[in-house]
């Protein structure tokens, strides 16, 4: 996928957020600077490479200094990346992030008790204040709730919430919602057993 195709996919993701156009979201521009640095750092540009990397560094300095967003150009991020309220967000350079991932403010994705760095699947949403630590995998279509600390892998299609933290399959939540719509009493679902 080309640089412009990735930016278009990101812009489409932002156009659905809050009814505002993509160019009015600060997170889009943070992502655009990352994508520029990633592309320049990995492309065989010959003598143009170093002046373009210098431009990337000039653009990245205010992002790190003012917004406190650490998004190294070595991070691998799929198209459709969206950061709402891009403040105090930290990624290690080796992180692998899937397609159509949404990140909110105060999120830390980094090293932890298990070796390695996290991997986020496709269509993952990470809400404000969440911490994903260590060599864990967050499956596709997961939602990580606000202020949750994750140190174990999460299977696909789960919602992880705080107090107490547990992973609930989205199918279970859908069935609960259907039952409530029909006027049935809901029963709390059993949490999944997590494995390393």
Where are the regions that the model predicts?
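Structural signal for interior beta-strand "rungs" in well-ordered beta-sheet cores
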Residues: 65-168
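Terminal amphipathic alpha-helical/low-complexity segments used for targeting or macromolecular assembly
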Residues: 1-67, 173-196
């Amino acid at each position: 996928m080309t640089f412009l195709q990735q930016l278009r996919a990101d812009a489409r993701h932002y156009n659905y957020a809050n009814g505002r156009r993509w160019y009015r979201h600060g997170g889009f521009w943070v992502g655009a600077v990352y994508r520029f640095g990633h592309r320049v750092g990995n492309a065989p540009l010959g003598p143009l490479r170093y002046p373009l990397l210098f431009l990337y560094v000039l653009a990245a300095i205010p992002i790190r200094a003012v917004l406190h967003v650490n998004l190294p150009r070595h991070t691998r991020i799929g198209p459709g990346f969206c950061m709402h309220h891009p403040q105090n967000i930290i990624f290690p350079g080796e992180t692998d992030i899937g397609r159509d991932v949404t990140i909110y403010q105060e999120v830390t994705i980094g090293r932890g008790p298990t070796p390695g760095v996290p991997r986020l699947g496709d269509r993952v949403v990470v809400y404000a204040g969440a911490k994903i630590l260590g060599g864990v995998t967050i499956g596709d279509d997961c939602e990580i709730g606000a202020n949750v600390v994750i140190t174990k892998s999460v299977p696909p299609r789960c919602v992880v919430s705080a107090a107490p933290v547990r992973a609930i399959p989205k199918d279970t939540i859908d069935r609960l919602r259907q039952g409530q719509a029909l006027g049935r009493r809901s029963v709390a679902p059993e949490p999944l057993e997590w494995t390393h």
